[in-house]
Amino acid sequence: MSIAEDITQLIGRTPLVRLRRVTDGAVADIVAKLEFFNPANSVKDRIGVAMLQAAEQAGLIKPDTIILEPTSGNTGIALAMVCAARGYRCVLTMPETMSLERRMLLRAYGAELILTPGADGMSGAIAKAEELAKTDQRYFVPQQFENPANPAIHRVTTAEEVWRDTDGKVDIVVAGVGTGGTITGVAQVIKERKPSARFVAVEPAASPVLSGGQKGPHPIQGIGAGFVPPVLDQDLVDEIITVGNEDALNVARRLAREEGLLVGISSGAATVAALQVARRPENAGKLIVVVLPDFGERYLSTPLFADVAD
């Protein structure tokens, strides 16, 4: 029988699909890795289970432990799902600028949510979590931005999936940077096997911290945290592309209407960057894998779908 023992065993093994109708001007092939096929509909499901499993194995979590994490949404949703399946209490801090759907999903999974000022960005959510952690020794903070289990799970799952599903023919990987775990873990594996492979990081033009600019507010939820995350190995990144807010929103809408892919704003940003790379003459005939981190349904209340609101 092929029966999962709990929902966490269904995380990973997400598919690749070729983009065909939004690729005007591209001379390279673009295939999208659809991370919304994970049970809680985002790439963060991978680290949600990985960080808690690592903590369990290290004896850092007990039955009365309270999982506490600052999140822009998707990691919190993943942790809330895993905590529900494992029986842990979950408390999350999140900037108030994150979508209404994110808040409702977190609470639907049974998590307790503490909102922090939007102007403070992820730094504010992190500071609040650190403050709370000092008040009760039962709190355990996975610390996604610096937890080695984050890139590790991408080494053993995401990277292997990309390599296997492209028969090792992947030439370029494009991924947005939130924690940096995805691009770091995948690059660590694929660059070792194929040194010619290139990795492109994507960040908001309105908060180009990785590019050496100043942090700023932006609507591309899930990337552009406003600081360089410790998990990110910048030596593995060959290029950083900044994407404008409207470009990200417009391409995310196009993915829904022209490819049938209902995805979030950061997926639009990653695809903008992938298209830019795919249009370069030197990349003719190459295979580009772009990571689409999450599902569009959790953005229905945001500017992404304002044009279809009643």
From Swiss-Prot:
MF annotations from Gene Ontology: cysteine synthase activity; L-cysteine desulfhydrase activity; pyridoxal phosphate binding
Residues the record lists as N6-(pyridoxal phosphate)lysine modifications: K44
Principal EC category: transferase
GO cellular component, one term: extracellular region
Stored Pfam families: PALP
Cofactor(s) the protein needs: pyridoxal 5'-phosphate
PROSITE patterns in UniProt: CYS_SYNTHASE (PS00901)
SUPFAM superfamilies: Tryptophan synthase beta subunit-like PLP-dependent enzymes
Record keywords: Amino-acid biosynthesis, Cysteine biosynthesis, Pyridoxal phosphate, Transferase
GO biological process per UniProt: cysteine biosynthetic process from serine
The EC number(s) this enzyme carries: 2.5.1.47
List of residues binding pyridoxal 5'-phosphate: N74, G178, T179, G180, G181, T182, S266
Cited function: Catalyzes the conversion of O-acetylserine (OAS) to cysteine through the elimination of acetate and addition of hydrogen sulfide.
Subunit structure: Homodimer.
Family label: Belongs to the cysteine synthase/cystathionine beta-synthase family.
Protein name as catalogued: O-acetylserine sulfhydrylase
Lineage: Bacteria, Bacillati, Actinomycetota, Actinomycetes, Mycobacteriales
Gene this protein is translated from: cysK1
